[in-house]
A protein has these predicted regions:
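Mid-bilayer segments of alpha-helical transmembrane spans in multi-pass integral membrane proteins
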Residues: 116-129, 160
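Membrane-interfacial loop-to-helix junctions in multi-pass transporters
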Residues: 143-153, 182-190
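Membrane-interface helix/loop boundary segments of multi-pass membrane proteins
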Residues: 165-191
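Small-polar-interrupted transmembrane alpha-helices in polytopic inner-membrane proteins
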Residues: 188-201
Length: 218
């Protein structure tokens, strides 16, 4: 039902290709420019540091700016991605955000908050047990209220946008697009799951815990 509800707009199949290979990349690049400009201005005159930035050395990039500013700038491209997906959904395909989100008549926010509460409770319980019973030496109380409040604001405002951008693009927009173009039910699920997993290949948890972590992405 989720894919079927948008198959009436098959004539806009080209929009899925245009969005995937042009509109989304351009939006991500545009929203990445502030980070690049600030990094370059900070490293200007230091040839070694500039070379590291040009090579994509994440450690070097992270060392240049204040951590909260770095996080804010790194999350900005996801704002561009989400806006691009919404733009294409509304303007090119003439679909609604509700149709991109669910096959139900309206978005069921109670399910969203239930899932958030469930995983939040599981995570909090695991951290509590780990801190109190298993490896308390891995934790250190180091509260600096000013930076913490800034970090809290960034996390509350931008992390939901990051996760929504990824999910809407891969599990929503691409899944519907591949379904519309291929007319197949299984192909969209397989392709988007693999693509979502590969996108997270460079994540640090993959290097630390191994490829088994892919299960959580796929």
């Amino acid at each position: 039902m989720y894919i079927k509800q948008v198959t009436d707009n098959k004539e806009t199949w080209w929009g899925y290709l245009l969005t995937t290979f042009l509109i989304v990349p351009i939006a991500v690049i545009l929203f990445s420019i502030p980070h690049g400009v600030i990094l370059t201005s900070k490293a200007f005159g230091d040839e070694e540091l500039m070379a590291k930035i040009a090579s994509g050395d994440m450690a070097a990039m992270m060392s240049i700016l204040e951590p909260n500013l770095n996080l804010f700038l790194m999350l900005l491209p996801f704002v561009g991605m989400l806006l691009a997906v919404f733009f294409s959904t509304k303007i090119i395909h003439k679909n609604t955000i509700r149709e991109l989100t669910t096959s139900r008549e309206k978005i069921d926010w109670s399910r969203v908050f239930f899932a958030f509460g469930l995983w939040g409770s599981i995570s909090a319980t695991m951290i509590f047990l780990d801190y109190n019973f298993f490896t308390p030496e891995n934790y250190e109380w180091n509260l600096n209220l000013g930076p913490f409040l800034i970090l809290f604001a960034i996390v509350i405002l931008l992390l939901p946008i990051q996760t929504s951008a990824e999910e809407y693009f891969f599990r929503g927009y691409l899944m519907q697009g591949i379904g519309v173009i291929s007319g197949n039910r299984w192909l969209p699920l397989i392709v988007t799951s693999l693509a979502f997993g590969l996108m997270h290949y460079a994540n640090p948890e993959i290097a630390k815990f191994g490829n088994v972590v892919y299960v959580f992405y796929i």
